[in-house]
Curated annotation (Swiss-Prot):
Alphabetical list of NCBIfam families matching this protein: hip (TIGR00988), PRK00199.1 (NF001222)
InterPro entries: Hist_DNA-bd, Histone-like_DNA-bd_CS, IHF-like_DNA-bd_dom_sf, IHF_beta
Subunit organization: Heterodimer of an alpha and a beta chain.
Function field: This protein is one of the two subunits of integration host factor, a specific DNA-binding protein that functions in genetic recombination as well as in transcriptional and translational control.
Sample GO molecular function, one term: structural constituent of chromatin
GO BP: DNA recombination; regulation of DNA-templated transcription; regulation of translation
A GO CC term assigned to this protein in UniProt: chromosome
One of the Pfam families matching this protein, by short name: Bac_DNA_binding
Protein name, per record: Integration host factor subunit beta
Length: 102
């Protein structure tokens, strides 16, 4: 699903709202999440999940074309951890979070 499809679905479920207003709301929510992450804050949507940023330290990498060693600078990357309700909905009837693949 892409953002425009999300806007269409939300607008269809809420016929009392104009499509333009739904689009503005979706954009505002995404902008607030982005701004919070850019400020180094964590955004938690209970039951759905939590957005945060993690630091990837600098390291040596390899250019896949040439095989040359290259320096990869430190960077911050977005990270999403699913909430319990989302995990349960995706995996109905699944046991605890512990992975017992034995």
């Amino acid at each position: 699903m892409i953002k425009s499809e999300l806007v269409q679905i939300v607008a269809a479920r809420n016929p009392h709202l104009y499509h333009r207003d739904v689009e503005n709301i979706v954009n505002a929510v995404l902008d607030e999440i982005t701004d919070a992450l850019a400020a180094g804050n964590r955004v938690e949507l209970r039951g759905f999940g939590a957005f945060s940023v993690k630091n990837r330290p600098s390291r040596s990498g390899r250019n896949p074309r040439t095989g040359d060693t290259v320096f990869v600078e430190e960077k911050w990357v977005p990270f999403f951890k699913t909430g319990k309700e989302l995990r349960e909905r995706l995996n109905p009837g699944a046991g605890d979070e512990d992975d017992d693949d034995n």
